[in-house]
Amino acid sequence: MPVKFSKVLIPQPRSKFIKVRCPDCGNEQVVFSHAAMVVRCLVCGRVLAEPTGGKARLAGHVVKILE
């Protein structure tokens, strides 16, 4: 009796890098989706992402999700 081989599933990460636009100055900056620290805009200093214990809460506009 032949043995059936099942497909080996490779786990993919759920976290991603996200390009965010600052609502005040329009600067685009790359932020980690599960940021553990407060992320501020490099130009004006506004908070773009704040940690929540899992995914970060984004305050800017998401421009692109980087793969």
From Swiss-Prot:
GO terms for biological process: translation. The keyword Coiled coil does not apply. GO terms for cellular component: ribonucleoprotein complex; ribosome. A zinc finger (C4-type) spans 22-44. The keyword Ribosomal protein applies. Keywords: Metal-binding, Ribonucleoprotein, Ribosomal protein, Zinc, Zinc-finger. Its cofactor is Zn(2+). Binds 1 zinc ion per subunit. Pfam families: Ribosomal_S27e. GO terms for molecular function: structural constituent of ribosome; zinc ion binding. NCBIfam families: PRK00415.1. Belongs to the eukaryotic ribosomal protein eS27 family. Part of the 30S ribosomal subunit. This is Small ribosomal subunit protein eS27.
